[in-house]
Amino acid sequence: MDKRLIAERFARARDTYSHEARVQQQVAEKMLQLLTERASPLFRRIVEFGCGTGSYSRLLLHKLQPESLLLNDLCPEMKECLTDLLPQDTVQFIPGDAEALDFPEKTDLITSCSTLQWFNDPKEFFARWHRFLSEDGY
């Protein structure tokens, strides 16, 4: 899978993505519903990989109110879509390939919506990312 090409295509679509990605918005809303119904209600430290334009990110921030929300996307240009979130002290953006990056240890929740299909080795990703979770993390 050519990650450079994927990033370029998402960069070109970023201005219209939020308006066109209705299914992804529904997935984000359902994901948040499942999290709040079935998981720990307190997630102090959250990492979202593949944040894109931030639809799911905004839901996470509003509903879960974490102490820190670390957003990641393969496409560095997605930062331009997060300008309403980034001035907040609790939110940070790190661009890059989530399969290759290391993130803070003792994270309470590592989450994403509509992203894993772009990964070369999801099994390895989960094995590696497991070490970043807190003892009770998801």
Where is each model-derived feature located?
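A short acidic, Gly/Pro-enriched loop at the edge of an enzyme's catalytic core
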Residues: E99-I110
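A short SAM/SAH-binding and catalytic strip from SAM-dependent methyltransferases
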Residues: D108-P122
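Conserved alpha-helix/loop element of class I SAM-dependent methyltransferases that forms part
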Residues: R22-F43
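A short glycine-rich, Lys/Arg-flanked "PGG" loop and its adjoining helix->strand segment in the class I
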Residues: K123-Y138
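A generic alpha-to-beta junction signature in SAM-dependent methyltransferases
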Residues: A39, L64, L86, L133-E135
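N-terminal, positively charged/glycine-rich alpha-helical extensions of SAM-dependent methyltransferases
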Residues: M1-D15
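Class I SAM-dependent methyltransferase SAM/SAH-binding core
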Residues: R45-L101
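A structural alpha-helix within SAM-dependent methyltransferase catalytic domains
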Residues: L32, R58-L61, F126-H130
